[in-house]
Structure formats: C-alpha cells, structure tokens
C-alpha cells in the first residue's frame, strides 16, 4: 500500500504543518509514503514531496496510493479541497467547522477583490457574482433546505456565529472512504451530521520536551518573580482573551503581582493592546508575537497557570493544549464538551457561565493552591506520555489506513465547479 499525504508542510506557519511532518516520519517506517503540498518543498523531509497538482499524473503508477487529506479551518488547506472531493481517501479533520475558510477563499478570490476595488464596473461585478455563486452552490449542496439563505447572510454579513451552526464539512465527509478525528466528541458530532460515515478516532501524537525549571525559564526569558498567566496561540477573541483581561484586572485589584503573557501572533480584527489600555492594565500585559518552538517551551515553563479558554470551538483538538500538558504545565480550559476527553486530574476547568468573576475565582483558587498545581503538572505529563506519544498516533493511523484500503469509494453528487 502506497500512502499519499496532502498537507501544508513546514515552513508553512500552521500547527498542521508540524503535525504532518511528524506523521510522515512515523508512516514512512510502515508504508511507502509521499507528500503533496502547495508551498515551498522542504528539502529536509525524509520522504518524497511533490507539488499537489502532480498527484493525478503520479496516480497512474501502480499500486495506486491511498490519499490522506489533512484539512483544517484555514486558507493553508484550500489546495486540498477539490482533489479530496475527486479522489476518495482518508480525510483527517483538524477542525469540524470549515465554513470560515471556505467563505474566506471566495471573498478573497481575485474576482471579488477586483470588484470591491472598482464597484462601479459592471463587468467586474458579474465576475464576482459568478464566483460567489460557486460558494452558494456549495452551501446549498450541504444544506438543501436552508443553504440559499445561509449563503446570502454569510456573503452580506460575514457569517459570524452562524458559520459554527453550518460547519460545511458534509461534502468532504461524504465523498471520502473514512474520516479521522482526534476526539470522541468530534466523532459523535460527525456521526450526527453525516450518519453512516466511517469515522475513527486517532490519538494526536505530541513530542514531549525536556523539562526546564520555572526559575531557569524565567531567567532565560528575562522575566522576574511575578505570578505569570499565559495564553498560547493566535490571539483571537475566540480564546476568551477579553474575559482573561478583565480577570487580570480583578487580580491586580486584589493585590496579586501578576503579568499576563500572550504567546502568539495577532490578527487585524482584534486589538488586544487597545483593550488592555482601555482597562488600565496595559503595563501588565505582554505580547510576544509568533515565537520559535524553543521559546514556546520556555514561556510554558515560566508560567504559573496556562490559559486555554477557546470558545466557541470549531471542533478541534488543540495541539497547543496537548503541548502545554506535555510540558507538565497547570492548564485551565473552558469547561465544555471537548474537555470531557481529558481526565479530570490532568487539567483545571473554568466555567463557561458568567463573566470575568467566574474565571477570576477559578484562577485565584488555583494560585492559592500550589499543591494542586503540582498534582496537575505531574498528571498532565503522565497523561500525554501514555495517550499522546507519537508511537500511538503512528499505530492508530496504520490500523485505519489498512481498514480504509478495503472500503469502496463513495459517489456523491457535487456542484458543477467541484466535479
């Protein structure tokens, strides 16, 4: 059996690229493997790597490869979408909600961008409308009863929370032999939306770093002895940063000498610096921007509590959360369905109800209980070592690929532009 893995790969700035690089190393020990990507080809990969457009030509070689599609809710994955509909294989969903990236692809298309820059041009208007009609056709195919209205609202208003209600994964799921996800909750949601699909859970492999003491990490980063709260990953409203900032203000008002560090890049539509300034706490908030891996581990080691509060979720298993647990950190998450996949002793939970008062109380309770933090840190590292080491991911994938090879290719009706 040959395996053809489609994914963004390093140096693409996405966690799925790092995930796929690790996966390729493990699968190459079990099967002949080749990779397909849209960006620059990393010469350091240990497997053959090709531009994705060459796949159909190479698929004439026997034995034919079983495609493995790594899909997430970002534009880094757009090149995979159409080929995953035409060549059934194994679909790996890193997010259940794909609607944001599909809408963004159409709204950022040359046709739409050119019309927005010259809205009096009727020719450009017609081209933009034709392009957006393809998006509408996708939504209608996934949701025959309400798709037209959903697409219209999304085009006019950007969708917002509506896109979480209409995840737009249905066509991909139904067009492929098997779907892999990383949590039981994601599996259950897929089986609700696409009954009869072959959905399996594979454990996400995480490489465990060498432990660095909190004192050494702070010394290397130039941090002092303040209490440190830290959030990791792209700084977006969905990470509940606003509530964390207001909780930080409460902690400061209670006399806690605390700093909040946000480790990750920022986005144009959310000005966290301005929000901190409006709250009067800007001097207690530090933004690092996107950091290299070694700095990620140092900031994790330096923190007293790591906050991973994303809500709403796109159905993802957070690789960032798993990495923090692998580092043996005390991590607080939003208490929602996705968190049920983790043992109670491996992380702390913050209620989704209420405003910053609830998070303030949860954080203060954990800060006042160093013994509990130490127990969380130990349990977190033990959990990752047992359930998320790379070897178990490689075995899970191998079993699923062998099973998928014998599943007949499904056939579904697609919009004409995707056929």
Language-model segment annotations:
Residues 185, 205:
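Carbohydrate-associated surface elements
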Residues 5, 180, 223-239, 245:
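Conserved donor-binding/catalytic core segment of Leloir-type glycosyltransferases
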Residues 210-223:
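A short helix/loop element that forms part of the nucleotide-sugar donor recognition site in Leloir-type
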Residues 372-386, 399:
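A short, well-ordered alpha-helix in the C-terminal region of glycosyltransferases
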Residues 326, 330-334:
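Short hydrophobic beta-strand element within catalytic cores of glycosyltransferases
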Residues 272-294:
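Nucleotide-activated donor-binding/catalytic signature segment of Leloir-type glycosyltransferases, i.e.
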Residues 39, 206, 232, 259-273:
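Glycosyltransferase donor-sugar binding loop
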